[in-house]
Amino acid sequence: MGLEEKLPSGFLLSTVESFAGYLRKGSVWPATFGLACCAIEMMATGAGRFDIARFGMEAFRASPRQADLMIVAGRVSQKMAPVLRQVYDQMAEPKWVLAMGVCASSGGMFNNYAVVQGVDHVVPVDIYLPGCPPRPEMLLNAILALHDKIQHTPLGVNRQEAVRAAEQAALAATPTIRMEGLLR
């Protein structure tokens, strides 16, 4: 994000990291990636009854270059997976991903060749939100959990190492379609 990449590891004090995290968690700009019925609940969260604006997220961004949170709401097909990855790569650092619903988290009831069995095989996921579809209150709770994670995320070199490790673990995981046992 600029200065923090140029600082050597361990240079910042923890209080400075906490303060930067506190400021970051209040200015999260989500990019919508609504693919199925979970997107309806995500839109309801932005309405007046649930008021996501109190967390500083009233404007959902249409451009990934203006967003730092991707909410993947719904199932991801094999043809949509490269598009999802491209949108993720275009987002500015630091960036976070929230998998909304069981379809985004694990493929849901669509356990076939055409659906990615969990969006974490394409991009690293920070928060998993269960439900089919999850209620807006659950999305708000997941956003609060993400705020806590953002506040305690390291800066600089430590952040880059953590992101690389999460991406390698996600891409090295066995796809659910190849697993045996209760899933098949």
UniProtKB/Swiss-Prot annotation:
It is found in: Cell membrane. GO terms for molecular function: 4 iron, 4 sulfur cluster binding; iron ion binding; NADH dehydrogenase (ubiquinone) activity; NADH:ubiquinone reductase (non-electrogenic) activity; quinone binding. The keyword Iron-sulfur applies. It catalyses: a quinone + NADH + 5 H(+)(in) = a quinol + NAD(+) + 4 H(+)(out). SUPFAM superfamilies: HydA/Nqo6-like. Its cofactor is [4Fe-4S] cluster. One of its GO terms (biological process) is electron transport coupled proton transport. One of its GO terms (cellular component) is respiratory chain complex I. Its EC number is 7.1.1.-. It holds the Pfam family Oxidored_q6. InterPro entries: NADH_UbQ_OxRdtase-like_20kDa, NADH_UQ_OxRdtase_20Kd_su. Keywords: 4Fe-4S, Cell membrane, Iron, Iron-sulfur, Membrane, Metal-binding, NAD, Quinone, Translocase, Transport. [4Fe-4S] cluster binds at residues 37-38, 103, 132. Signal peptide: none annotated. It is a peripheral membrane protein. Binds 1 [4Fe-4S] cluster. Belongs to the complex I 20 kDa subunit family. NDH-1 shuttles electrons from NADH, via FMN and iron-sulfur (Fe-S) centers, to quinones in the respiratory chain. The immediate electron acceptor for the enzyme in this species is believed to be a menaquinone. Couples the redox reaction to proton translocation (for every two electrons transferred, four hydrogen ions are translocated across the cytoplasmic membrane), and thus conserves the redox energy in a proton gradient. NDH-1 is composed of 14 different subunits. Subunits NuoB, C, D, E, F, and G constitute the peripheral sector of the complex. NCBIfam families: nuoB_fam, PRK06411.1. This is NADH-quinone oxidoreductase subunit B. It comes from Nocardia farcinica (strain IFM 10152). The lineage of its organism: Bacteria, Bacillati, Actinomycetota, Actinomycetes, Mycobacteriales. The gene is nuoB.
